[in-house]
Amino acid sequence: MLISGANPTHVSAALKRYDVEKLAVATVASHTALQILRGAKRFGFRTIAVAGRADAAEFYRQFGFIDEVWTADFRNFVKTAEKLVEANAVLVPHGSYVEYVGWRQALEAPVPTLGCRELIRWEADQYKKMELLQRAGVPTPRVYKTPEEVDRPVIVKLFGAKGGRGYFLARDREELRRRLAGLGEYIIQEYVFGVPAYYHFFSSPVYGRVEVFGADIRYESNVDGRTFGWVEPTFVVVGNLPLVLRESLLPTIWKYGVQFAKAVEEAVGCRLAGPYCLESIIRDDMSISVFEFSGRIVAGTNIYMGYGSPYSVLYFDRPMDMGERIAHEIREAARRGRLEDLFT
């Protein structure tokens, strides 16, 4: 089924009709919603949380910085998106948004959506994701098309945003063949030895730059637990830990972020706007291998909610978390008549 995506003309027309003095910022009630909506409220925007369950809605209603909490059927999100347009709202997407509503609906939703919406289509395919990273010229793990090519330990990843669920390691091709039986869509990657590091970036059309904003480590069950070799390791993300990088690594990490932003514009055809993440392993020789990306805000940015990221102060001379950074960009774009540079 070919999905064309939201009509850019309709999105542009919606933005032109919006009252920029009364903009609302909306997001799905999960993932980084608290951070996004808190930041939006601090910058003077009305805020809307869209929940898929009544119990989630009840939880989000307790926070005074959220003006409205809606309950929606995510199986028909286009209808909710139309209501958001009527509410003069823009949508900030995150990983749970794409997982809950599905990438096809995320492409079709008529509400102005932060960032390069077409990138969602690429993120639905693990092979296209690796193609984009390679096009960016960042070092990546080797990808194997068949088990017969495998000559070292590998990790198998399922397609889609699943928080690491269903991923597994295989030590050799025999183990790999056995465990691939009956699996859906997946990619086989070289398993890189080192420590994980996830880099948060912000691409700013308003300021014409890519900012390196912070970093985190994922806390995964059960690979990070006390399993003592008794169970097969799994990689389900349950939380995130803060990470301050060696300063000598920052120029390389920033360069990779810039190269990735350029590759998206060239290959996907739309400019990155807002937060994104490159996910990597750092080896003991300090070399970096980037194995994954997210084209929007990642949950790891929650580690500095309310405190500000360790690097935001370098750009603005005051700490700012990613929710506040998004709101700052929206406010400045609205003031300068440049909302169309942020939303697709």
Curated annotation (Swiss-Prot):
Its EC number is 6.3.4.23. One of its GO terms (biological process) is 'de novo' IMP biosynthetic process. PROSITE patterns: ATP_GRASP (PS50975). Mg(2+) binds at E279, E292. ATP binds at residues 153-198, 220. Signal peptide: none annotated. This is 5-formaminoimidazole-4-carboxamide-1-(beta)-D-ribofuranosyl 5'-monophosphate synthetase.
